[in-house]
Amino acid sequence: MEFFNVGKIVNTQGLQGEMRVLSVSDFADERYRKGSQLALFDEKDHFYSEVEIASHRRQKNFDIIKFKGMNHINDIEKFKGFTLKVSQQHLSDLDEGEFYYHQIIGLEVYENDVYIGTIKEILQPGANDVWVVKRQGKKDLLLPFIPPVVLNVDVEANRVDVAIMEGLDDED
């Protein structure tokens, strides 16, 4: 079974079994919805156990979650540093033009059929995601995921076509 990263447990929160999670999930509200099933992996990326979400809220840059049946700090302290993952079977179908991060990371980026680089990371600074493109011999290029910039995404062809707007590439 294939698993995809959702977030990393960075600390406990209070005494009632809540944890601070630094999320890398594309759909945090869906991932941490009450009743959602996630898998815990230890620091060496070994499967530990499946867990069910009991509660979720946002606080600053963290998602605060609680697992069903774990109501005290002593129950969850051992999970610090663990990674939360979702199994492929728990991924929902997306609408046209929506993608999971794992589908985007690794795609090749082209402008006017000229290879630019490969998407290595996705940032969530605000209203729009920003795709980080690793380029050969140049600094990484930050591309906002907006229609004037991202023209076409073809996951099957491993390709993204873009139009780099003036001011986005400070090496030109």
UniProtKB/Swiss-Prot annotation:
Q: Which residues cross the membrane?
A: none
Which gene is the coding source of this polypeptide chain? Answer: rimM
Q: What is known of its domains?
A: The PRC barrel domain binds ribosomal protein uS19.
Purpose of the protein: An accessory protein needed during the final step in the assembly of 30S ribosomal subunit, possibly for assembly of the head region. Essential for efficient processing of 16S rRNA. May be needed both before and after RbfA during the maturation of 16S rRNA. It has affinity for free ribosomal 30S subunits but not for 70S ribosomes.
Q: Which Pfam families does the UniProt record give?
A: PRC, RimM
Q: Which GO terms describe its molecular function?
A: ribosome binding
Q: Please state which protein family the record places this protein in.
A: Belongs to the RimM family.
Query: Single Gene Ontology BP term?
Result: ribosomal small subunit biogenesis
How is this protein named in the record? Ribosome maturation factor RimM
Q: Does the keyword Cytoplasm apply?
A: yes
Task: Give the record's GO CC terms.
Answer: cytoplasm; ribosome
UniProt key word Cytoplasm? yes
Tell me the subunit arrangement: Binds ribosomal protein uS19.
Domain PRC barrel residues, every copy: 95-168
InterPro entries referenced in this protein's UniProt entry, alphabetically: PRC-brl_dom, PRC_barrel-like_sf, RimM, RimM_N, RimM_N_sf, Transl_B-barrel_sf
Report which superkingdom the organism of origin falls in. Bacteria
- Keywords annotated in UniProt: Chaperone, Cytoplasm, Ribosome biogenesis, rRNA processing
Q: Where in the cell is it found?
A: Cytoplasm
